[in-house]
């Protein structure tokens, strides 16, 4: 069954799986192999679209120093685009550049963050660059986690910039959300989704091992997140139980993959060379200096192995000992621990831990593995006629909204706590048949089971309208936005947060240039006609002054627009 040699007996107890050093909401541990620059092109933050470039501003990490103004707190200005030179003959539908939801702000004084958030003195985690603390937004009352990074301790600015860029691209139920980025003279602040349920590692220590069904529920979420990021040519490179958090302490709490500091772009047929990772979970090809996305599959296989038996497949007295065994890639299923584990589970582990990474199972094929299919049927959620009708009505309501309101609701859906979407999150996952973290129209059709051809055509058009970023798929936030309870739109703090995303320079109005800053044409970044942008503005601009002020914006959002 398993191609690996059976001559590497378990060394006994789980030795130093994690050296507890007060951490670890951010996932930095002493056993993590020292990082170095990738052979892939360095990615830094550009002013508008975060495109790739190589120049580094050593004074500021998220913003150019020229953005500093006399005001105490200043948002990044939108790109100055001359509307008049745009092609007036284009009649294109604008799409939403959703990376703009993550706001970047320069703080003029070191204490300005505490005017926005009430910071808890208790540390959620501690890493090599700084601490992670719980924080309460003083306007909305929402709880977040803030990763406070001491800029003096940063030894790889490009890695940090790449982490921010990659997190801005993520939109998956099991990947930690980045909400905001702040920077002052001394520190960088990453405002993140708060997870209060602890690490998967701690659950392993507490329970020792998990049943196959409990293991399936965890691995399903891990593989879904990997399928999502691999489809975007992103690899994590440091997947381990310490970097997997539970959202809350409930028995059915979802998990979140955190710490994308070692993540990198890896295009198809492209190999990386940098040696990064953690000894227990690192793939042997990384140690050899030539690897691709499937290094994450190896790490996942190690996690699955540990969940089922309570100890790692490659164990040792110290890191050198562990790495020697990883290089050999030999492991066994000790009958003392594995006799009651199914053959299908062992086969999947062997496919994940295939020493030849080119032959290792692809993440998109795992969902069709026998072991996965068996448990998927146990956990099948039926979309009944009542829910089907309810969803179609929500999609129709969303379709009728003006363009800016659709985009603003998308911003709100991204910012809200996951607990607000418990039912819809499960519905999204039920629709996601292939487990890749996004929905196709075909997947939604299959679940809604709409048989009437005329309704099918109408539904197809409605579903196309949900795709606000124009990537041809219904992403997690897009689905939640269409299902959002509109009563929340009457909350002033919620609307102000959404308004801020469009009002890039913070002057209280949304201009044509600022609207262009968050819009694009499909994935081609083509310009819009002057008429398209003006029409989007006119839908909300009650006094016809060419701008959208907050009063107009709030009336639109709350449904009080005349």
From Swiss-Prot:
Disruption phenotype: Sporozoite attachment to the substrate is normal but sporozoite uninterrupted circular movement is impaired. No effect on cell traversal but reduces invasion of host hepatocytes. Reduces merosome release from infected host hepatocytes. Infection of mice with knockout merosomes causes a severe delay in host erythrocytes infection without affecting the asexual replication in host erythrocytes. Pfam families: EF-hand_7, Pkinase. Residues 394-429 are annotated as: J domain. One of its GO terms (biological process) is positive regulation of cell motility. Residues 419-453, 454-489, 490-525, 528-562 form the EF-hand domain. Gene3D superfamilies: EF-hand, Phosphorylase Kinase, domain 1, Transferase(Phosphotransferase) domain 1. It catalyses: L-seryl-[protein] + ATP = O-phospho-L-seryl-[protein] + ADP + H(+); L-threonyl-[protein] + ATP = O-phospho-L-threonyl-[protein] + ADP + H(+). Its EC number is 2.7.11.1. A motif (J domain EF-hand interaction motif) lies at residues 403-412. Its cofactor is Mg(2+). Residues 118-372 form the Protein kinase domain. Activated by calcium. Upon calcium binding to the EF-hand domains, the C-terminus of the junction domain (J domain) undergoes a conformational change which results in the dissociation of the pseudo-substrate inhibitory motif from the catalytic domain. This, in turn, may facilitate the autophosphorylation of the activation loop at Thr-278, which leads to the kinase activation. One of its GO terms (cellular component) is microneme membrane. ATP binds at residues 124-132, 147. GO terms for molecular function: ATP binding; calcium ion binding; protein serine/threonine kinase activity. Ca(2+) 3 binds at residues 503, 505, 507, 514. Calcium-dependent protein kinase which acts as a sensor and effector of intracellular Ca(2+) levels probably in part downstream of cGMP-activated PKG kinase. Plays a central role in host erythrocytes and hepatocytes infection cycles. During the liver stage, involved in sporozoite motility and thus in sporozoite invasion of host hepatocytes, probably together with CDPK1 and CDPK4. Involved in merosome egress from host hepatocytes, probably together with CDPK4. Required for the release of hepatic merozoites from merosomes in the host blood stream. Belongs to the protein kinase superfamily. Ser/Thr protein kinase family. CDPK subfamily. This is Calcium-dependent protein kinase 5. It comes from Plasmodium berghei (strain Anka). The gene is CDPK5.
């Amino acid at each position: 069954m398993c191609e690996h040699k059976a001559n590497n007996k378990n060394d006994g107890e789980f030795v130093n799986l994690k050296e507890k050093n007060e951490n670890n909401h951010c996932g930095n541990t002493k056993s993590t192999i020292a990082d170095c620059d990738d052979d892939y092109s360095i990615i830094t933050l550009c002013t508008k679209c975060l495109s790739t470039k190589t120049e580094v501003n050593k004074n500021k990490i998220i913003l150019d120093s020229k953005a500093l103004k006399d005001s105490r707190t200043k948002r990044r200005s939108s790109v100055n685009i001359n509307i008049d030179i745009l092609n007036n003959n284009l009649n294109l539908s604008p799409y939403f550049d959703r990376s703009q939801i993550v706001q970047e702000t320069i703080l003029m004084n070191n204490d300005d963050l505490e005017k926005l958030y009430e910071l808890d003195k208790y540390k959620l985690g501690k890493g090599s660059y700084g601490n992670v603390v719980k924080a309460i937004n003083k306007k909305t009352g929402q709880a977040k986690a803030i990763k406070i990074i001491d800029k003096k301790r940063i030894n790889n600015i490009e890695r940090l910039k790449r982490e921010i860029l990659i997190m801005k691209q993520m939109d998956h139920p099991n990947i930690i959300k980045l909400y905001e980025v702040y920077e002052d003279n001394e520190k960088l602040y990453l405002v993140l989704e708060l997870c209060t349920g602890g690490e998967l590692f701690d659950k392993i220590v507490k329970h020792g091992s998990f049943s196959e069904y409990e293991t399936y529920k965890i691995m399903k979420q891990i593989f879904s997140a990997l399928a999502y990021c691999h489809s975007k040519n992103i690899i994590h490179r440091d997947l381990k139980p310490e970097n997997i958090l539970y959202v809350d302490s409930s028995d059915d709490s979802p998990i979140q993959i955190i710490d994308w500091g070692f993540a990198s772009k890896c295009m198809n047929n492209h190999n990386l060379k940098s040696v990064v990772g953690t000894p227990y979970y690192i793939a042997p090809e990384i140690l050899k200096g030539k690897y691709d996305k499937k290094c994450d599959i190896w790490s996942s296989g190690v996690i699955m192995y540990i969940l089922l038996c309570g100890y790692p497949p490659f164990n040792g007295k110290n890191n050198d000992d562990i790495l020697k065994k990883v290089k050999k890639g030999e492991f066994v299923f000790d009958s003392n621990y594995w006799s009651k584990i199914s053959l299908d589970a062992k086969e999947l582990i062997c496919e994940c831990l295939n020493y030849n990474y080119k032959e290792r199972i692809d993440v998109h094929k795992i969902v069709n593995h026998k072991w996965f299919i068996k448990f998927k049927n146990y956990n099948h959620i039926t979309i009944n006629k009542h829910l089907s009708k309810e969803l179609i009505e929500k999609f129709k309501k969303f379709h009728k909204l003006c363009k800016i309101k659709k985009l603003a609701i998308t911003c709100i859906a991204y910012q809200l706590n996951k607990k607000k979407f418990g039912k819809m999150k499960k519905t999204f996952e039920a629709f996601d048949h292939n487990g890749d973290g996004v929905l196709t129209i075909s997947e939604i059709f299959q679940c809604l089971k709409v048989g009437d051809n005329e309704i099918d055509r109408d539904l197809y058009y409605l579903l196309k309208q949900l795709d606000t970023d124009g990537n041809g798929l219904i992403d997690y936030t897009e689905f939640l936005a269409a299902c959002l309870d509109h009563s929340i739109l009457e909350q002033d703090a919620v609307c102000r947060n959404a308004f801020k995303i469009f009002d890039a320079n913070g002057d209280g109005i949304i201009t044509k240039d600022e609207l262009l800053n968050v819009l694009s044409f499909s994935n081609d970044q083509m310009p819009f006609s002057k008429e398209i942008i003006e029409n989007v503005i006119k839908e909300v601009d009650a006094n016809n002054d060419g701008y959208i002020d907050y009063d107009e914006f709030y009336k639109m959002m709350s449904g009080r627009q005349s």
